[in-house]
């Protein structure tokens, strides 16, 4: 069957005109509709549920259902094996969530882990001031890209993009605005000048996307750490924190890992686990939650080599994403305007979510900030002795940090499509990369009798030790195909009456819906070639 794509696609609507409340509302509504469609699909098919739903839910907390947890596990495994299997100088760690409170004093989180927040008085909505400005800057960047695209179409093969960007008056004006806003924003953030940040928002006439007004409150700082009490007796307890990042567990264990695993610099430590942030502005489904999962790697290097390794890991991490086969224009690098308190270089890999380009992964050059501060506050040496140069030093660190929940949303939003077939039927399909799909193979007996169910279950028995398989005999074969399409199952195996005589089955591929006949004894090899994770790892 020929396919015709419907309009429900995970793309970002054009930015509305600055002075158009109606256009802004319509654009936001379009993006919200796309996200709502995705959220509805995720709930209906067992990927994500609102946490505590029977009690009307808890804001910005979600539970992963049967297929969601499988997809999460597969993403985690892909990351873990890409880190620890493909790099001999990378090992793993699983540190505790609770840590000595001095950890967070040394790391700077007690004093500097804040978000600048601003409220719109009319809509009563709260926003991060820096994000409002970054989204405003992005609109100018979009204007530049549109001008460049127009130039490419006009001049064809003779188009000189570098010269065009340098000479086109519209591009130059937009770039001047970007430079001006970024300059003022960086100065305000570096100086922690909240009034200057608010004034910049007012000067740029940035409006609330809900109310369409620029009626803003003052900007205030909010610390993002969750505090709790350790101890059961009142007056004898002490304040500890739910970790806001997994990285500090790696830093305090640096020497333990280095000595026990006999590692030499450069080497890395990888960890996945839960982190917690008291996000005041928590929204957009699983994109920004108060409880989330990180996949972080800290790479320890000799001081002075950080720029080389920073570029190395930028390239490596983008290659990891691109190996999944998603369109290249879904990704871009974004350099930080304001560096975190621990960094001398930082950038994000941004992804085109339904709500636009947003941070997916961060790559940071953390210098010796963390190890140096832990050494000072703890009084314990956290130094590496280099036998080749006969010197001792506190290593520098390059970090890669990706939110597992955001990666989940990125894959789900890019994979979800609603297709209209030639016969007018609409099918929901998740075009997930086959090695990451929650269910790899569905085995479907054509009918529930004549020995077909028994044959189907025998096939599952040969495959289930290697792959997550699903048996389904309810409803017509067409409806069963649609169910598997909706959860992203890459291959369906149909057992029919001919199977009993020719010992062959029909394999249907999810994306093309093409079918082929395969002998049962060849199934393990055929399926492995199509869905094995090693196929992704070989691309790296």
What is each residue range found by the language model?
Residues 7, 11-24:
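Short, positively charged and aromatic/hydrophobic N-terminal segments
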């Amino acid at each position: 069957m020929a396919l015709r794509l419907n309009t429900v696609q995970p793309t970002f609507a054009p930015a509305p005109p600055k002075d158009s409340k109606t256009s802004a509302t319509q654009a936001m509504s379009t993006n919200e509709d796309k996200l709502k469609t995705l959220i509805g699909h995720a709930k209906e098919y067992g990927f994500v549920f609102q946490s505590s739903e029977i009690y009307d839910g808890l804001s910005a907390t979600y539970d992963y259902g049967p297929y969601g947890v499988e997809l999460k596990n597969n993403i985690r495994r892909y990351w873990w094996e890409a880190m620890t299997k493909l790099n001999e100088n990378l090992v793993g760690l699983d540190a505790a969530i609770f840590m000595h409170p001095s950890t967070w004093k040394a790391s700077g989180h007690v004093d500097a882990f804040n978000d600048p927040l601003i409220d719109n008085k009319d809509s009563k909505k709260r926003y991060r001031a820096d994000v409002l400005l970054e989204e405003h800057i992005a609109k100018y960047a979009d204007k530049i890209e549109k001008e460049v695209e127009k130039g490419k179409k006009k001049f064809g093969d003779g188009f000189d993009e570098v010269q065009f960007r340098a000479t086109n008056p519209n591009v130059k004006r937009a770039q001047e605005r970007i430079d001006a806003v970024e300059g003022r924003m960086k100065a305000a953030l570096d100086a922690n000048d909240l009034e200057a940040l608010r004034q910049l928002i007012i000067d740029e006439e940035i409006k609330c996307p809900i109310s369409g007004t620029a009626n803003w409150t003052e900007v205030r700082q909010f610390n993002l750490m969750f505090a709790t009490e350790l101890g059961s007796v009142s007056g004898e307890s002490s304040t500890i924190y739910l970790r806001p990042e997994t990285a500090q567990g790696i830093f305090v264990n640096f020497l333990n890992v280095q000595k026990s695993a006999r590692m030499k610099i450069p080497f890395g430590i990888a960890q996945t686990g839960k982190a917690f942030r008291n996000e005041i502005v928590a929204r957009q489904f699983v994109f920004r939650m108060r409880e989330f999962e990180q996949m972080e790697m800290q790479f320890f290097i000799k001081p002075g080599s950080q720029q080389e390794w920073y570029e190395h890991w930028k390239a490596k991490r983008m290659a990891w994403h691109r190996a999944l086969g998603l369109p290249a224009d879904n990704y871009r690098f974004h350099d930080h305007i304001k560096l975190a308190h621990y960094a001398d270089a930082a950038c994000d890999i941004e992804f085109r979510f339904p709500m636009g380009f947003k941070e997916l992964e961060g790559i940071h050059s953390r210098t010796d900030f963390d190890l140096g501060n832990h050494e000072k506050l703890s009084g314990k040496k956290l130094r590496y002795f280099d036998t080749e140069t006969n010197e001792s030093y506190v290593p520098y660190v390059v970090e890669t940090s990706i939110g597992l929940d955001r990666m989940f949303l990125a894959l789900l939003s890019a994979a979800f499509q609603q297709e209209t077939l030639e016969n007018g039927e609409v099918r929901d399909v998740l075009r997930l990369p086959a090695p990451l799909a929650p269910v790899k193979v569905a085995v479907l007996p054509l009918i529930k009798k004549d020995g077909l169910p028994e044959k189907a279950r025998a096939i599952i028995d040969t495959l289930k030790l290697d792959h997550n398989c699903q048996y389904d005999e309810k409803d017509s074969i067409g409806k069963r195909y649609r169910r598997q399409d909706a959860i992203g199952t890459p291959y369906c195996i149909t057992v029919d009456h001919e199977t009993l005589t020719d010992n062959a089955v029909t394999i249907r591929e999810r994306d093309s819906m093409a079918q082929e006949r395969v002998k049962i004894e060849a199934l393990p090899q055929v399926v492995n070639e199509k869905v094995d994770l090693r196929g992704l790892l070989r691309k790296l």
